[in-house]
UniProtKB/Swiss-Prot annotation:
HAMAP family: RraA. GO terms for cellular component: cytoplasm. Transmembrane segments: none annotated. Keywords: Cytoplasm. Globally modulates RNA abundance by binding to RNase E (Rne) and regulating its endonucleolytic activity. Can modulate Rne action in a substrate-dependent manner by altering the composition of the degradosome. Modulates RNA-binding and helicase activities of the degradosome. This is Regulator of ribonuclease activity A.
Length: 171
């Protein structure tokens, strides 16, 4: 399904938080949405792997990597694992690598930057805790909507199906 964060903001602006514009799209799906599972880790992707091994249908993995530009938390192997387990997308407050392979995958991936250096895999970090970056506090189970324009979150699901009347009002 396609999501348009601009249209969603036009309708639901008082119900959503808008993440500061710092992310770029690295995955094969330009838009994605779902309930978030949070991970807080720094230059270590062990917990990320454990989480992506779970069923991700309807879910987005939101990773607070401390904004690190030194090591990539997501690579092609982890993205393939996410795709295999039906995750809707991954948002990384940090870096990714193997970007040519990532853009061929049927999963949404947004991150700050890319770097060829991989992360360690010791499993250090925390899962399903509130995290804060981009001017927004993300709570486990919040709903996240992302496209090439930006990322927004809501405590409640938003209708992506705009009726004709609503579409006419937006024009």
């Amino acid at each position: 399904m396609e999501y348009n964060t601009s249209a969603l903001c036009d309708i639901y602006l008082d119900q959503v938080d808008v993440v500061e514009p710092m992310f770029s799209n690295f995955g094969g799906c330009a838009s994605f949405a779902g309930q978030i599972t949070t991970i807080k880790c720094y230059e270590d992707n062990g917990l990320i792997r454990e989480t992506l091994e779970q069923d991700g249908l309807g879910r987005i993995l939101l990773i607070d990597g401390g904004g690190s530009l030194r090591r990539a938390l997501i690579d092609a192997e982890l993205a393939a694992l996410a795709e295999e387990n039906e995750w809707e997308g991954i948002v990384v407050y940090g870096s990714v690598r193997e970007v040519d392979e990532l853009e061929e995958m049927s999963i949404g991936i947004q991150a700050i930057a890319s770097i060829p250096v991989g992360a360690t895999s010791q499993g250090i970090g925390e899962v399903d805790i509130p995290v804060n970056f981009g001017g927004v506090t993300f709570l486990p189970e919040d709903y996240l909507y992302a496209d090439n324009t930006g990322i927004i979150i809501s405590q409640e699901p938003l209708s992506a199906d705009l009726g004709e009347e609503e579409e006419d009002e937006l024009l």
